[in-house]
Amino acid sequence: MKRIPFVLLALLLSGVACSDDSEGPKKERESDPVTLTLSDPNATEETKALYSNLWAIQSKGFMFGHHDDLMYGRTWYGTEGGSDTKAVCGDYPAVYSFDFAEHIDDRHASDPDAQALRLRCCREAYDRGMVLASCIHINNPLTGGDSWDNSSNRVAAEILTEGSATNRTFKEWLDRLADIAHNLRGSDGKLIPVIFRPFHEHTQTWSWWGASCTTTEEFV
């Protein structure tokens, strides 16, 4: 199975010494250095910068995002530069979210035009300086149902059973995801860092990876 170069690395942010000479005795306050650790020692410089910047701005506020913002809106579809957020707020969102599921599971060849559009929008978002985040509402690799097919509690177990049909299917899907990650580049030619958030809402019961279908050990 190919290695997915999605985000996470190690960075050191230096502490900041603060002093106030205007009132009373000189006071000096130093913050301890913070070590940020990513799981991938080969993370790209863009990935490192993304993680560092997200850490640095957390005390200043939050970032507004909109799913598929550049791909379609209330009255348009696929218009380059389109954004309902921009139409309402005057600017593009800081975070662009999208779903890669249809690129990797058994729907991967079903709508090449929509897939090409989604990848184009990802590149456009990166070029605009947005933070990219991807979820994957992939189909059920055991039953062939959709993400919400929670009819079996054996899906995760079969995925984790080396050599099973479900295990092989799931690895094939991950290989397709790896291909995207290795080839998704901005206009600067650099790989685009993506915050990958699979299997979200896993404590709920409505998906095949949810609490009604998996054990804590299987999920971890």
For every predicted segment, state its role.
Residues 6, 56-58, 89-91, 127, ...:
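A generic structural signal for short, non-catalytic loop/turn and secondary-structure boundary residues
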